Amino acid sequence: MLMVISPAKTLDYETPPVTQRFTQPQYLDHSQELIQQLRELTPAQISELMHVSDKIGGLNAARFGSWTPAFTPDNAKQALLAFKGDVYTGLNAETLSEADFDYAQQHLRMLSGLYGLLRPLDLMQPYRLEMGTKLANARGKDLYAFWGTRISEWLNEALAEQGDDLLLNLASNEYFSAVKRTALNARIINTEFKDLKNGQYKIISFYAKKARGLMSRFVIQERINDPAQLKQFDVQGYRFSAEQSKADNLVFLRDHAPE
């Protein structure tokens, strides 16, 4: 089983990594093509393109300017440890064992607007470039056109390497839309995490994002390889709902969030 998750806007390059092992991103030639184009934009143009403040636009202009394809532990950090935010709070990679990192390296991928697809131990230099960014480029009108079927093809390779055709989608719609299903040789398993609010079970963004991270960690630590085993997920009060689920769309409900 291969999992995909979204990246995060929040990054941590201050905390020392809990593992010294690292790998190099596999598709840096594509990243470099984007970087060269982004370097042509002023900070104000970056702010407008990304719909962010002048401060964040300036920060990312500086990041694009200093980006170099020579990735080392001195200028980059393992992607799974660099990303922060709700999904990564749930995943809590800082407490994984070396054996867990080995398993994650085979069975987890992070979708990325700049890097396309990242493995957990791939070094990553800081950036912000969301997949939904309408950056016109030589390949089309936006990043979905830029990546085309490449991400699906790379996922096919990763699926083949780890031994089955099961793809567990724990990414947002914005990011999973970069996966072209017609080019994907996989059985896709989707998940929904709902919390009780005002008498109804609803998807609450903050909790759902964290739950995707919790599920990722569950799969890594339990070495899950059968979709039926996913139904055993009962972390932080969630339970599987057979009533609301369909064959490849698993729904988990929770009545009370932890304090």
UniProtKB/Swiss-Prot annotation:
Which parts of the chain are coiled coil?
none
Pfam families given in the database record: H2O2_YaaD (PF03883)
- TM region(s), chain numbering: none
Q: Which superkingdom heads the taxonomic lineage of this protein's source?
A: Bacteria
Q: Which GO terms describe its biological process?
A: response to hydroperoxide
InterPro entries per the UniProt record, alphabetical: YaaA
Give the UniProt entry's GO cellular component terms. Answer: cytosol
Mind telling me which HAMAP family this protein's record contains?
UPF0246
Q: Which family does it belong to?
A: Belongs to the UPF0246 family.
Know the name of this protein?
UPF0246 protein PFL_1025
Organism annotation: Pseudomonas fluorescens (strain ATCC BAA-477 / NRRL B-23932 / Pf-5)
